[in-house]
Amino acid sequence: MEDFVRQCFNPMVVELAEKAMKEYGEDLKIETNKFAAICTHLEVCFMYSDFHFINEQGESIVVELDDPNALLKHRFEIIEGRDRTMAWTVVNSICNTTGAEKPKFLPDLYDYKENRFIEIGVTRREVHIYYLEKANKIKSENTHIHIFSFTGEEMATKADYTLDEESRARIKTRLFTIRQEMANRGLWDSFVSPKEAKKQLKKDLKSQELCAGLPTKVSRRTSPALRILEPMWMDSNRTAALRASFLKCPKK
């Protein structure tokens, strides 16, 4: 599973997931399913934000090409992926600026058009079950919940899906592709079932022992557009949208 994650996700997404797991004292070598889940969630958050701006008239627009003459503001502030201290700093700043109620738990995004925090969920189970779990945990009407599944289903607070159909279709297609690629490698069942995951982990560890002496080569390919991710990610005054040119999973 770890090899799959490193091949199928952009290196910056992988790096952020590694930092998140390290912050919580989790070992990605052991909790490989969680590693894959975090990378998937991060990518969905980026894709949710991608290309969405607010123009001078305060209208939400979708722009896929940079126009240096356009005075545009990013519609979404990405909170997910930051360390906890920085994330809460961003949340507090948003609350002070907009008057929004401070959430009890760290949300994933803030929508400047609708003036609300958003909690993104990606589930391997039934969307309505995961939605209810999120709602019961958050217990706040001020945080909007949007759940996606790997089967193309989705569920959102008051059936308000925030994004246009095309933007949501991009996310659903990516999730379906991840599922298919996992299935092709025999990883999907273990990703869904904890029991299967334990069997897969034992199998992977045994395989690593057998291959310990073999030379390895790691791909470091990064699309040119994604090289702007790190400075854009850390800079609240981002100047360009994160492009949706995520690395495609190489065929085995």
UniProtKB/Swiss-Prot annotation:
Compartment annotation: Host cytoplasm; Host nucleus
Keywords: Decay of host mRNAs by virus, Eukaryotic host gene expression shutoff by virus, Host cytoplasm, Host gene expression shutoff by virus, Host mRNA suppression by virus, Host nucleus, Host-virus interaction
InterPro entries (alphabetical): PA/PA-X, PA/PA-X_sf
Site, Important for efficient shutoff activity: residue positions: 28, 65, 202-203, 206
Key word Zinc-finger present: no
Positions of the record's site feature: Important for efficient shutoff activity and nuclear localization: 195, 198-199
Coarse class of the protein's main subcellular location: host cell
Superkingdom per UniProt: Viruses
Keyword presence, DNA damage: no
UniProt-annotated catalytic positions: 80, 108
Domain notes: The probable endonuclease active site in the N-terminus and the basic amino acid cluster in the C-terminus are important for the shutoff activity. The C-terminus acts as a nuclear localization signal. The C-terminus is recruited to host protein complexes involved in nuclear Pol II RNA processing.
Task of the protein: Plays a major role in the shutoff of the host protein expression by cleaving mRNAs probably via an endonuclease activity. This host shutoff allows the virus to escape from the host antiviral response. Hijacks host RNA splicing machinery to selectively target host RNAs containing introns for destruction. This may explain the preferential degradation of RNAs that have undergone co- or post-transcriptional processing.
Name used for this protein in its record: Protein PA-X
